[in-house]
């Protein structure tokens, strides 16, 4: 497919060109200061790209520029894709959000919840109920990440060899069985904790469909949508377009760091963070959701299913700050933001720290990639770079503020 291109003048799409120039200048300054290698930003109204800027370099050492067809590791932006894969199976009646996960993955039978202790002295009790598919979709299953360091169960993940998402050398099936052997942090459905749950969903797709996750996504999502640059590895022909990955240094600069092993099909197919993609493909996926399940005559999901995916599912209508299970979730940026089936959802714009319309949904990746859909404004936005920050940064709130300032109708 051709690279993403601008399709309509900003003014004709209800956007202020001068405000968009300020947006570009803001992030170009970060490139000049050595805080970003380069970036791509795209803003679309009504499905047509009204602003597209590619600036800086995708590989600083090699002097290669960011272009419209640059490829990016989108990491956790994989999660909404995995959710769509699950929902296609739900629509076909092959599983339900209410199904116990152990119906398909027996290792999740008889889950146990952490009570106390550390190491070999951990005390657990039987969970009051099963882990259900819907708990995985909403990150309320009680799973975690090993790189967190605020709960004893986090340490148990690290001790089991899964500090990130996978034990070295393991495949998806082996890794998911390992997750199931570890205690839950809390009773399923009672708290929110961002976790490895989408990897479990990826394995669920494999078991229910009888296909490897990469094959299922290629045949059922990427192929029908024309997302030819999205997958779990890059081909020889694509490799030259892949951006270098950087990490943030102590002084706020950047330095190259190892990234996903994308050359050749990976042994571990991560439904949480394994995809590489392009701006064109991300735009296609966002438009599929904005148009409630259909794009260019291809329907992947029913409108009601997309509506279900993109509404808040946290118990009692809570937001992430109220239901979050750890101090990291108790942040002002989580006020007024709920969680759907793989995406965050704005449920109270008056309480969010970044200007967003009611019902705006989307998700981000650890290398500072993000997309969102504001259905009330027929707006989709994406921002791509490749920097893993040491801590929270201002890219996302700055981007939301600057896009909001550009909206004139």
Question: Which stretches of residues belong to each language-model region?
Answer:
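Short, surface-exposed loop or secondary-structure junction motifs
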Residues: 3, 110-355
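Short, conserved catalytic-motif segment at the N-terminal edge
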Residues: 11-74, 96, 110-122, 393, ...
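Short, conserved phosphate/pyrophosphate- and ester-handling motifs at nucleotide-, phospho-/glycolipid
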Residues: 16, 79, 278
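Active-site SXXK
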Residues: 21-27, 47, 73-101, 198-206, ...
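Short, well-ordered beta-strand elements
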Residues: 50, 371-372, 378-387
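A generic structural motif
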Residues: 56-58, 261, 387
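Acidic helix-start/capping segments at beta-turn-to-alpha-helix junctions
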Residues: 102-110
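Short, surface-exposed beta-strand/loop micro-motifs that present aromatic residues
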Residues: 362, 367-376
């Amino acid at each position: 497919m051709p690279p993403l291109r601008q399709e309509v003048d900003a003014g004709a799409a209800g956007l202020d060109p001068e405000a968009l120039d300020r947006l570009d200048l803001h992030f170009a300054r970060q490139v000049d200061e050595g805080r970003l290698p380069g970036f791509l930003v795209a803003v679309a109204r009504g499905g047509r790209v009204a602003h597209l800027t590619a600036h800086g370099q995708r590989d600083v050492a090699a002097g290669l520029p960011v272009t419209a067809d640059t490829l990016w590791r989108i990491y956790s932006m994989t999660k909404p894709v995995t959710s769509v894969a699950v929902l296609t199976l739900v629509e076909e009646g092959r599983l339900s959000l209410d199904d116990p996960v152990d119906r398909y993955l027996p290792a999740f039978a008889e889950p146990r919840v952490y009570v106390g202790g550390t190491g070999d002295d951990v005390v657990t009790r039987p969970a009051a109920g099963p882990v259900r598919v819907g708990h995985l979709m909403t990150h309320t299953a009680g799973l975690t990440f090993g790189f967190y360091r605020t709960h004893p169960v986090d340490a148990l993940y690290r001790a089991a060899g899964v500090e990130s998402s996978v034990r070295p050398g393991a495949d998806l099936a082996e890794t998911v069985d390992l997750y199931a052997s570890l205690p839950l942090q809390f009773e399923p459905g009672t708290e929110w904790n961002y976790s490895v749950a989408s990897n479990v969903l990826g394995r669920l797709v494999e078991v229910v469909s009888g296909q490897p996750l990469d094959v299922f996504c290629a045949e059922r999502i990427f192929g029908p949508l024309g997302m030819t640059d999205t997958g779990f590895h890059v081909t020889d022909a694509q490799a030259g377009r892949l951006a270098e990955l950087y990490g943030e240094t102590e002084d706020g600069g950047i330095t190259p760091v190892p990234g996903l092993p994308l050359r050749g099909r990976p042994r571990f197919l991560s439904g949480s963070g394994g995809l590489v993609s392009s701006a064109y493909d991300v735009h296609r996926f966002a438009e599929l959701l904005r148009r409630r399940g259909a794009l260019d005559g291809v329907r992947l999901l029913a409108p009601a299913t997309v509506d279900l995916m993109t509404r808040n599912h946290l118990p009692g209508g809570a937001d992430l700050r109220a239901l979050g299970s750890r101090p990291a979730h108790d942040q002002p940026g989580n006020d007024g933001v709920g969680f759907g089936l793989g995406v965050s959802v704005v449920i109270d714009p008056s309480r969010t720290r970044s200007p967003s319309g009611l019902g705006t949904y989307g998700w981000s990746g650890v290398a500072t990639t993000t997309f969102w859909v504001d259905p009330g404004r027929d707006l989709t936005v994406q921002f791509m770079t490749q920097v893993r920050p040491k801590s929270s940064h201002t890219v996302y709130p700055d981007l939301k503020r600057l896009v909001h300032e550009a909206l004139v109708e």
